[in-house]
Amino acid sequence: MQNPKDDVLYAPIEWQDHSEGYTDILYHKSLDGIAKITINRPEVRNAFRPQTVKEMIQAFADARFDEQIGVIVLTGQGEKAFCSGGDQKVRGDYGGYQDESGVHHLNVLDFQRDIRTCPKPVVAMVAGYAIGGGHVLHMICDLTIAADNAIFGQTGPKVGSFDGGWGASYMARIVGQKKAREIWFLCRQYDAKEALEMGLVNTVVPYAELEKETVRWCREMLRNSPIALRCLKAALNADCDGQAGLQELAGNATMLFYMTEEGQEGRNAFNEKRAPDFSKFKRNP
């Protein structure tokens, strides 16, 4: 319920359009630090093709490296679908989805890694179908805000496909091994309430309130320490992501150390051609 003392969280959001040059996505930013990437292929339930993923990767990189952006929202155009996975009409015979030149891609795996390793929180804003590869995309996002018309599930085994990476292992971490096997082996579909009960989504709201609620969650996170958020994201990912997860966590620790006087003493001593003096720093237990 809205707190009347905190109207800023519910203030209307003003999006600036940065979609020029894109054909398959829409890209917007707000002045208060939120970026929104929208899959814009409603005629195919926002299924992605190689061009779609290429554009998402480009926009995502822009949002990641924009120091004014603190949270990234991923969504689909319209109320009928978040994303229905890979566009089977362009799926080829040589291990991927064909682009216009005939080259086969599975570049959605690169986009999954981008979401996972981005130091900024990524929020899936889901209305309608989040199916197949679209279901995996929303799971990999840090948070999922779902409309009451959202439908979740995997279709891979029905169309000769599967995701044996995060789509399987991370799902099992969220819903448990038995439920994950049910979702994959039976290819059933689940409504928003069922998804909430399984822990697949964070909250469910009426469709008319979906963007408003998503923005509220984003603004709440923007009030918190960005370094704390990035370190927590890396820490929460590390147990699932193996050495890559540990690398991300360690990289954040290195970044923090570089900000300390102790870390800067070593750098300064090297540049000043003198021996470093670390004796002034406490050796805490």
Swiss-Prot record:
<feature type="binding site">
    <location>
        <position position="273"/>
    </location>
    <ligand>
        <name>substrate</name>
    </ligand>
</feature>
<feature type="binding site">
    <location>
        <position position="258"/>
    </location>
    <ligand>
        <name>substrate</name>
    </ligand>
</feature>
<dbReference type="InterPro" id="IPR014748">
    <property type="entry name" value="Enoyl-CoA_hydra_C"/>
</dbReference>
<feature type="binding site" description="in other chain">
    <location>
        <position position="161"/>
    </location>
    <ligand>
        <name>substrate</name>
    </ligand>
</feature>
<feature type="binding site">
    <location>
        <begin position="154"/>
        <end position="156"/>
    </location>
    <ligand>
        <name>hydrogencarbonate</name>
    </ligand>
</feature>
<feature type="binding site" description="in other chain">
    <location>
        <begin position="129"/>
        <end position="133"/>
    </location>
    <ligand>
        <name>substrate</name>
    </ligand>
</feature>
<feature type="binding site" description="in other chain">
    <location>
        <position position="155"/>
    </location>
    <ligand>
        <name>substrate</name>
    </ligand>
</feature>
<feature type="binding site" description="in other chain">
    <location>
        <position position="97"/>
    </location>
    <ligand>
        <name>substrate</name>
    </ligand>
</feature>
<feature type="binding site" description="in other chain">
    <location>
        <begin position="84"/>
        <end position="88"/>
    </location>
    <ligand>
        <name>substrate</name>
    </ligand>
</feature>
<dbReference type="GO" id="GO:0008935">
    <property type="term" value="F:1,4-dihydroxy-2-naphthoyl-CoA synthase activity"/>
</dbReference>
<feature type="site" description="Important for catalysis">
    <location>
        <position position="97"/>
    </location>
</feature>
<dbReference type="GO" id="GO:0005829">
    <property type="term" value="C:cytosol"/>
</dbReference>
<dbReference type="GO" id="GO:0009234">
    <property type="term" value="P:menaquinone biosynthetic process"/>
</dbReference>
<comment type="function">
    <text>Converts o-succinylbenzoyl-CoA (OSB-CoA) to 1,4-dihydroxy-2-naphthoyl-CoA (DHNA-CoA).</text>
</comment>
<comment type="similarity">
    <text>Belongs to the enoyl-CoA hydratase/isomerase family. MenB subfamily.</text>
</comment>
<feature type="site" description="Important for catalysis">
    <location>
        <position position="258"/>
    </location>
</feature>
<dbReference type="InterPro" id="IPR001753">
    <property type="entry name" value="Enoyl-CoA_hydra/iso"/>
</dbReference>
<comment type="pathway">
    <text>Quinol/quinone metabolism; 1,4-dihydroxy-2-naphthoate biosynthesis; 1,4-dihydroxy-2-naphthoate from chorismate: step 6/7.</text>
</comment>
<dbReference type="InterPro" id="IPR029045">
    <property type="entry name" value="ClpP/crotonase-like_dom_sf"/>
</dbReference>
<dbReference type="Pfam" id="PF00378">
    <property type="entry name" value="ECH_1"/>
</dbReference>
<feature type="binding site" description="in other chain">
    <location>
        <position position="45"/>
    </location>
    <ligand>
        <name>substrate</name>
    </ligand>
</feature>
<dbReference type="InterPro" id="IPR018376">
    <property type="entry name" value="Enoyl-CoA_hyd/isom_CS"/>
</dbReference>
<protein>
    <recommendedName>
        <fullName>1,4-dihydroxy-2-naphthoyl-CoA synthase</fullName>
        <ecNumber>4.1.3.36</ecNumber>
    </recommendedName>
</protein>
<keyword id="KW-0456">Lyase</keyword>
<comment type="pathway">
    <text>Quinol/quinone metabolism; menaquinone biosynthesis.</text>
</comment>
<dbReference type="InterPro" id="IPR010198">
    <property type="entry name" value="DHNA-CoA_synthase_MenB"/>
</dbReference>
<keyword id="KW-0474">Menaquinone biosynthesis</keyword>
